[in-house]
């Protein structure tokens, strides 16, 4: 009412630009239009709440100086993403022309993305196809789920590469790129990714009967998911 004094504490302004940082990168291929980088586990792809530095974008700006601007100030050059704890291949656009070409391929599901995943348990079959819509979890907004009413179609194809009795190494191809898709689908399959603290993998370690295997799994400081192959058509050449 009239005469009241109102004090307002405003949150600190978010930075409007990303500062280049001299962070080592493993560049597997680079030309004038794009580059392919092997992102390490534990690195966030681009700045967001709680992660204003130390991201892949910070490192890329130091390495390249200039990237495609289509993704905006905080996501220059970023055409697709990997989860923080997932390692592996990412293609980055250095020019707007390359960005548009690559983004179109991802939108049309023309890019072939293959992962390796170490999962708990010994699958009963040598492979399979999972077709379950993935969307935001109905009660936990930080998780994804196949029980969401607003889920989007998602397809995951997997096959066993090696069996270790208490675990298995899978080769996983995704025909869609939904958030946490592989982790959610493999958990629904009954074989969560080793080291995945969100979708049941961390608690599953208590069921591993082999002490040596359990110790090795417990020593992992990340989820055992790696993007090891990425096939696309060069957007320029």
Q: What is the predicted function of each stretch?
A:
Residues 1-237:
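RNA pseudouridine synthases
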């Amino acid at each position: 009412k009239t005469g009241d004094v109102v004090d307002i504490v405003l949150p600190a302004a978010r930075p409007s630009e990303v500062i280049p940082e001299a962070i080592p990168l493993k560049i597997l291929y680079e030309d004038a239009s794009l580059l392919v980088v092997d992102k390490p586990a534990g690195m966030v792809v681009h700045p967001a709440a709680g992660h204003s530095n130390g991201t892949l974008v910070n490192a890329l700006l130091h390495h390249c100086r200039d990237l495609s601007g289509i993704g905006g100030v905080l996501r220059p050059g970023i055409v697709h993403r990997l989860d923080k704890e997932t390692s592996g291949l990412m293609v980055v656009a250095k020019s707007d022309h390359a960005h548009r070409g690559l983004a179109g391929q991802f939108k049309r599901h023309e890019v072939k993305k293959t992962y390796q995943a170490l999962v708990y348990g010994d699958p009963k079959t040598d492979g399979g196809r999972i077709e379950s819509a993935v969307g935001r979890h109905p009660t936990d907004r930080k998780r994804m789920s196949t029980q969401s009413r607003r889920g989007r179609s998602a397809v995951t194809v997997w096959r066993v590469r090696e069996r270790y009795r208490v675990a298995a190494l899978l080769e996983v191809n995704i025909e869609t790129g939904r958030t946490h898709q592989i982790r959610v689908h493999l958990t629904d399959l009954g074989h969560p990714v080793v080291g995945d603290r969100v979708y049941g993998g961390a608690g599953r370690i208590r069921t591993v009967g082999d002490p040596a295997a359990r110790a090795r799994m417990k020593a992992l400081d990340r989820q055992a998911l790696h993007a090891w192959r990425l096939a696309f058509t060069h957007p320029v050449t």
